A protein has these predicted regions:
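Acidic/histidine-rich catalytic cores and adjacent linkers
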Residues: 1-16, 22-29, 45-196
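Short, surface-exposed amphipathic charged segments that create phosphate/polyanion-binding patches used
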Residues: 29-40
């Protein structure tokens, strides 16, 4: 991330670096997955293979937003809350960080600072590492929540262009790929011959 910041600031001296909320929450999801794997390995090591097996099937329930959970996934989360407090705290840390980006201005900054304090005191090594990473990039995160910026639209266009590139595999020239991209993403709507 540092290389892109240096390049952007060299080209645009007055630019404000804003970090994408999706990627910040992805960091928290990765930290949560580290905790999940640690707990899973610990349960297997101490001989609780039944709980370990049940925990292994909970990955997607931990990753998803709470409002998108199925009944079965909600039951898995309830089981985690009852049987494994450290993993559930890691899940709550991830969800509270996600909630920071649903607010704007001073409220979001206050929520981020509260989250940083909680993560620092959590005694969960993966989230303490995440605390240091987010503290390092705090200015970019605050700029993002203050301005309400996201890379979501750019990411979706890039994904669509990669799909069109795969579709265009076998075209004789790159001009045909460019024409396909312009037709699909560029808003160009030529009149077709023989149609009114």
């Amino acid at each position: 991330m540092e290389w892109i910041a240096e390049t952007a600031l060299a080209a645009c001296e007055n630019a404000t670096l804003c970090l994408d909320p999706f990627h910040i929450v992805r960091w928290a999801t990765d930290a949560l997955d580290v905790v999940r794997r640690f707990v899973w390995n610990l349960l297997r090591r101490i001989g609780l293979t039944g709980q370990a097996k049940r925990l292994k099937g909970c990955r997607y329930a931990l990753w998803k937003n709470p409002d998108h959970l199925s009944e079965r996934q909600a039951a898995k989360l309830a089981w985690i809350a009852k049987h494994n407090s450290s993993l559930y705290r890691a899940y709550l840390l991830k969800e509270h960080l996600r909630l920071v980006f649903q607010h704007r201005g001073h409220e979001a900054v206050a929520m981020l600072d509260a989250w940083l304090s909680w993560a620092r005191r959590s005694q969960i090594p993966a989230f303490i590492q995440l605390y240091h990473r987010i503290k390092k990039h705090r200015a970019g995160i605050i700029a993002s929540v203050t301005h309400g910026l996201s890379n979501g639209l750019t990411e979706s266009v890039n994904t669509k262009l990669r799909l069109l590139t795969r579709i265009a595999y076998g075209f004789r020239s790159t001009d045909n790929l460019i024409a396909l991209c312009l037709l699909d993403r560029g808003g160009h709507c030529p009149r077709l011959p023989g149609r009114s």
